[in-house]
Curated annotation (Swiss-Prot):
Enzyme Commission number: 2.5.1.141
Name of the molecule in the record: Protoheme IX farnesyltransferase
Localization annotation: Cell inner membrane
Stated role: Converts heme B (protoheme IX) to heme O by substitution of the vinyl group on carbon 2 of heme B porphyrin ring with a hydroxyethyl farnesyl side group.
InterPro entries per the UniProt record, alphabetical: Protohaem_IX_farnesylTrfase, UbiA_prenyltransferase, UbiA_prenylTrfase_CS, UbiA_sf
Domain of life of the native organism: Bacteria
UniProt keyword Metal-binding, yes or no: no
Organism: Hahella chejuensis (strain KCTC 2396)
Catalytic activity annotation: heme b + (2E,6E)-farnesyl diphosphate + H2O = Fe(II)-heme o + diphosphate
Length: 299
């Protein structure tokens, strides 16, 4: 009996943990932390580091849980998402919504009183943008859903920055622009790989409505746009040579994968491009930090 009870409790905890989409939130929090560190020349304020990260993570997890609730019919059709807790009946809608609401309330309270009101309101706007505007409306309405809804997912570095400064800085907006340009090739590569599942679920992703060839061209075009956007921190003097070299190398590799998709020259290029896009964003933001803390001068 003791082992059975322990297993049941552990399974319940894991279900709620899965509702938070921890891997997605972890990548978002990396970009938020980079925003914080780039904004702080005189040392990191403890309230921004601890409370800021906690509040942003809680609201991001709330948005993820709401996404599980809203998308459960779509998730039930797609192989990638069929085992999610709500689809499997391990967590019902009421408990999931209560969980999401609780995370949002606690997260807002932490940000509003422990960090600053601007960060709280911007983070709430990001939650609404992703969980309501994108998930509830755009995802089902237009093949440009990822483009139009991408701003909400691009916000974390701005949220991290404002948690330190309490203001919206142009440099933070450059980081938002990079993620905004990164979002379409990232998701469209997955959509090409999962085209049949999206079609079966009735989601008008670009490959479903316009075909693979059209989508691959736009992946290439947006990757070029991303490459240009990634150069802006160096061009504007925000970052130095370490970042420039890293962004150049990472960007050329991303373009190589986008070109391979366009030319159909590599097996499984779509899913490999999707996976590389995650590595790309992680390493690009690590390069931002390395450049910030390692002084390099060329004479």
């Amino acid at each position: 009996m003791k082992n059975t009870a322990s297993t049941t409790a552990a399974a319940g905890w894991r279900d709620y943990y899965e509702l938070c989409k921890p891997r997605v939130v972890a990548l978002m929090m990396l970009t938020a932390v980079v925003g914080m560190l780039l904004a702080s020349d005189q040392g990191m304020p403890w309230n921004a580091l601890i409370l800021g990260n906690l509040g942003i993570a809680l609201l991001a997890s709330s948005a993820a849980a709401i996404n599980h609730i809203v998308d459960q019919k779509i998730d039930a059709v797609m192989a990638r998402t069929q085992k999610r807790p709500i689809v499997q009946g391990r967590v019902d809608n009421v408990h999931a919504l209560t969980f999401a609401f609780s995370l949002a309330v606690v997260g807002m309270a932490i940000l509003a009183w422990g960090v600053n009101p601007l960060t709280a309101w911007l983070t709430l706007a990001s939650l609404i943008g992703y969980a309501v505007v994108y998930t509830l409306f755009l995802k089902r309405a237009t093949p440009q859903n990822i483009v139009l809804g991408g701003l909400a997912g691009a916000a974390p570095p701005l949220l991290g920055w404002t948690s330190v400064t309490g203001t919206v800085d142009p440099h933070a907006l450059l980081l938002v622009l990079i993620i905004f340009a990164w979002t379409p090739p990232h998701f469209w590569a997955l959509a090409v790989h999962r085209k049949d599942e999206y079609a079966k679920a009735g989601v008008p992703m670009l490959p479903v409505t316009h075909g693979d060839r059209y989508t691959k061209l736009h992946i290439l075009l947006y990757t070029l746009m991303l490459f240009a956007a990634s150069m802006l921190p160096f061009i504007t003097g925000m970052c130095g040579w370490i970042y420039f070299v890293a962004a150049l190398a990472l960007g050329v590799r991303f373009l190589d994968w986008a070109w391979a998709m366009w030319r159909d020259s590599r097996k499984h290029a779509a899913i490999k491009t999707f996976r590389y896009s995650i590595t790309y964003l992680m390493l690009l933001f690590v390069a931002l930090l390395a450049d910030h803390y390692i002084p390099v001068t060329l004479s």
